[in-house]
Amino acid sequence: MITQRQKDILNLIVELFTKTHEPIGSKTLQNSIASSSATIRNDMAALEKLGLLEKAHTSSGRLPSQEGFRYFVEHSLNPDSLDEQDVYQVIKAFDFEAFRLGDLLQRASDVLANLTGYTALILDVEPKKQRLTTFDIVKLSNHDALAVLTLDEASPVTVQFAIPKNFLDSDLMTVAKIARERFLNQTVLDIHYRLRTELPQIIQKYFPRTDNVLDLFDHIFNPIFQEEVFISGKIKTLEFAGLNTYQFLENLQSVALEIRQSLPEDELHRVQVADSKEKSLADLTVISQKFLIPYRGFGILTVIGPVDLDYQRTISLINVISRVLAVKLGDFYRYLNSNHYEVH
């Protein structure tokens, strides 16, 4: 347990260090702490013994340890402390007309990366929890067709495909019939299971040759099994992390899995200070927060940066962006209706 003065000293050192990245001495702290330099030095020594501060190699000053940053995040952070200029920049950035859901999510990722200077990711609603509400196949020509899948009433996905050479129009209708009977109102997780277990036997009843039909179903439904991930500032990881981290971020499905596993369902936000189980992120800070996607569930905003990032500003930015984004998404979904399709 630390005293209030020691807590104030730690908070001030974290605040100053994240702005200057220079060791902080007792004389610097005297301007804000109403105590003598000797008293402040004693408190700094006590904080060092507790593992919250570290000695600098090049000066007599101190800097926060990983435990010190964690303590600050858990006990002193004020996520509702917002800078007016940051709020203005966020609102201004979202002052545009979005034609697709992805436009808003990508803009959020871009704004978060630009204002923090770190890597930002936005995750859409987790695929496995969504339900298939409509399914249609539209024939475009004699050679290709379009499958239209709607998830949770407001997230249409289209998949264009080449019609198998041995297919008649009635065969396309049969594919649509099977999909509706077996998959409508089922979760994406259930659909994935049924594609592997029930579907092969069902198709045998309708088609003499099943290989290309199974491949067609896989092609049509594969997009809804993939995470929607919007990333910005990936190149910035090379400034504060190694090549391994950059390469890890190349595989967005693995990144999405790591983010979801690190943020339990019953938590809205989490700050990992050099605490990730993923080796490529183990020496970094990963900040994740859920945000509301109206009518569908929750997405996730994530920032990946160095341990000595500015926690107060970064988390405040995540807060304001999540709020503005939720409002914009609400407006977008109120406008959207069943006749609007997202074409991929």
Swiss-Prot record:
- Keyword Transcription regulation set for record: yes
Q: Which GO terms describe its biological process?
A: negative regulation of DNA-templated transcription
Disulfide bridge map? none
Q: Which GO terms describe its molecular function?
A: DNA binding
Q: Which UniProt keywords apply?
A: Repressor, Stress response, Transcription, Transcription regulation
Give the highest taxon in the source lineage: Bacteria
One Pfam family name from the record? HrcA_DNA-bdg
| InterPro entries found in the cross-reference section | GAF-like_dom_sf (IPR029016), HrcA (IPR002571), HrcA_C (IPR021153), WH-like_DNA-bd_sf (IPR036388), WH_DNA-bd_sf (IPR036390), WHTH_HrcA_DNA-bd (IPR005104), WHTH_transcript_rep_HrcA_IDD (IPR023120)
Functional summary from the UniProt entry: Negative regulator of class I heat shock genes (grpE-dnaK-dnaJ and groELS operons). Prevents heat-shock induction of these operons.
Family as reported in the entry's similarity comment: Belongs to the HrcA family.
Name by which UniProt lists this protein: Heat-inducible transcription repressor HrcA
